[in-house]
Structures are given as C-alpha cells and as structure tokens.
UniProtKB/Swiss-Prot annotation:
This is Ribosomal RNA small subunit methyltransferase A. Specifically dimethylates two adjacent adenosines (A1518 and A1519) in the loop of a conserved hairpin near the 3'-end of 16S rRNA in the 30S particle. May play a critical role in biogenesis of 30S subunits. Its EC number is 2.1.1.182. It holds the Pfam family RrnaAD. It comes from Streptococcus pneumoniae (strain P1031). It is an enzyme of class 2 (transferase).
Length: 290
C-alpha cells in the first residue's frame, strides 16, 4: 500500500486528526499512477538530489525517496511535520524543513545534502495560490536547478509554456522561457485529489537553458519592457509603452526611433512578439535612454 492510496491517505488524516487549511491551498494527490508518471517525467535516479515544496503527507515524497539520492521537502504547515515523520519513517534520505520556501536561505540548506554537488531537480505539487511567486523565486535564486517538474493549475502551465500569437502568451511566458524550456507533460484531472480543487492541473516540465534564450544588455529592463507590453492585452505596443514611459513628445520620439530600430510596427500587439523581438526592443529602448 502507498501513502497516496485513498484508504491510506484517509486513515493517516484521521489518525492525526488533520483538517485542511484553505489558506495553504492543500490538495493531496491520491493516484499512484500519476505519482509514478511524475517521477518518470522528472527522470529521477540516485545521481540526483530533489527539492520538494509542499509534501503534504508524503505521497509524492515516497516515490521520490525510492529513486533519488536525497529529498529535501519544504513544508510550511507545522501540523504536517509529525505526520511526515510517521509516513516517511522508513526513509533515511528525506529531510523535512518546516519553513516557507519564499523566506529560507535555500543556498545554505542545499549545502546540507550529503553530496551537494549532484544535480538538483525541483519536483513538487505547488499550492495554486502561490505557484508563480514560488517558481520565479526559485528560477531567479541563482541556484542552478537543472530541471523543474511541477504540478500546477492547468491555466498557469498553459501561460508559462505558451508561444507568441496565442491567448495564453504573456509576460509570465517570457519570464520563464528566458531561463528555461517549458512544456506541458500531461494533464491531471481534479478528481484525483482530496479535497478536489475547482480546476484541472497540469504537470509542467522545465529544463534550464545553458545560457538565457536571448542576450540582452539589461535583464531587469528587458522584463520591465515585456511586462509593460502586456499591461492591456487588446492595446497596441505603442499604447502600452507610452502608458509606461510617458506621453511627452520627447518620449514619443525616442519610442518611434526604438521601434524602427527593432523593426517593429507601433500597431503590433505584445502577444505577437517573440523573445528575440522583445530583446531587440528592450535594447533599442535602452539605447534611446528610456
């Protein structure tokens, strides 16, 4: 029997008198086939260390610990720590850290792996309410995670992996794809969770690029420009950029020159621009002193 078997999950929760906290976005997976598929998608073996976020009662952790060198699981809910000590008692390669992943010194924790030089993968069922902040925090942490295989709301997975000229494409797509390739591996129906969420989930596989997707003069400025370009999706690039940089004649003149230099029409919408075009635009705007 597995932790994720419905009868086991139910028994564990009852034994510990656990009640779900909506504020933590807790939904426990009760399908062992899907858990196996997640670990297979992540290609976990004994030459990999794993960071897990939100282990719950250890359903995914169990599958990870069977194959990984070590698993470090960050759980914000202190009530789950004794439950994890119970459900994962047979594993000596799991460390549970009762801290908020957004506030920990992750680089310091990683040094606590027995072999910190092994590749590190992030495998997790992320809380829906805070998926994007967690992902961006980890991606921008400077820690060279080789891969992320994470479950999230399907809509968010679609946005992250979206291509130009699609409804889902936006600044989040650019922010992630600048650092990583992103592809939806498979869909997870809402019916396999306790309690069931209101939406379906997706497993997103992201692999770190050896170097960023595009070369830019100023990364922060590149992200600001891409974000500004999607402020109002139905508006043109010109309208969004004048809304961000200002509408003085001087700004308009600089914008005109930058768009011309980047080979872009003022009437194009942000959703039509590739990462390469956003890079050209950001560098041209920077060159104009904006």
């Amino acid at each position: 029997m597995r932790i994720a078997d419905y009868s086991v999950t139910k028994a564990v929760l009852e034994r510990h008198g656990f009640t779900f906290k909506k504020s933590f976005g807790q939904n426990f997976l009760t399908d062992t086939n899907i858990l196996q598929k997640i670990v297979d998608t992540a290609e976990i073996d004994d030459q990999v260390n794993v960071i897990e976020i939100g282990p719950g009662i250890g359903a995914l952790t169990e599958f990870l610990a069977e194959r990984a060198a070590e698993v470090m699981a960050f759980e914000i809910d202190h009530r789950l720590v004794p439950i994890l000590a119970d459900t994962l008692r047979d594993f000596d390669n799991v460390t549970v850290v009762n801290e908020d992943i957004l506030k920990v010194d992750l680089a310091q924790h990683i040094q606590n792996f027995k072999n910190p030089d092994l590749p590190i993968k992030v495998v997790a069922n992320l809380p829906y309410y805070i998926t994007t902040p967690i992902l961006m925090h980890l991606i921008e942490s400077g820690i060279p995670f080789s891969e992320f295989v994470v479950m999230m709301q399907k809509e968010v997975a679609d946005r992250i992996s979206a291509q130009p000229n699609t409804k889902a494409y936006g600044s989040l797509s650019i922010a992630v794809q600048y650092y990583m390739t992103a592809k939806v591996a498979f869909i997870v129906p809402r019916t396999v969770f306790v309690p069931a969420p209101n939406v379906d989930s997706a497993i997103l596989k992201m692999v770190r690029r050896p170097v960023p997707a595009v070369a830019v003069e100023d990364e922060n400025f590149f992200f600001k420009v891409s974000k500004a370009s999607f402020t109002h999706r139905r508006k043109t690039l010109w309208n969004n950029l004048t809304g961000y940089f200002g509408k003085t004649e001087e700004v308009k003149d600089k914008l005109t020159k930058a768009l011309d230099q980047a080979g872009l029409s003022p009437s194009v919408r942000g959703e039509a621009l590739s990462l390469e075009e956003f890079a050209s635009l950001a560098d041209a705007l920077k060159g104009q002193g904006l």
